[in-house]
């Protein structure tokens, strides 16, 4: 079997609410850290989510 290309990463809220999204990423194609502006239901507004490693 071939090695899996995608890895799971965690997108952590910059509002420090503890809320996160889980997303797949191909580390060979996108080497830089991901950053998205998404909705944080705890803060109840759109904030920047930054990539962190899954434990």
From Swiss-Prot:
Keywords, alphabetical: Ribonucleoprotein, Ribosomal protein
Molecular function via GO: structural constituent of ribosome
Disulfide bonds: none
GO cellular component: cytoplasm; large ribosomal subunit
Protein's GO biological process: translation
Family: Belongs to the bacterial ribosomal protein bL33 family.
HAMAP family, sorted: Ribosomal_bL33
Protein name, per record: Large ribosomal subunit protein bL33
Species this protein is from: Rhodospirillum centenum (strain ATCC 51521 / SW)
């Amino acid at each position: 079997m071939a090695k899996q290309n995608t890895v799971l990463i965690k997108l952590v809220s910059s509002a420090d609410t503890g809320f996160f999204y889980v997303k797949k990423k191909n580390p060979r194609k996108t080497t830089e850290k991901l950053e998205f502006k998404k909705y944080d239901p705890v803060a109840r507004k759109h904030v920047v989510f930054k990539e962190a490693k899954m434990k």
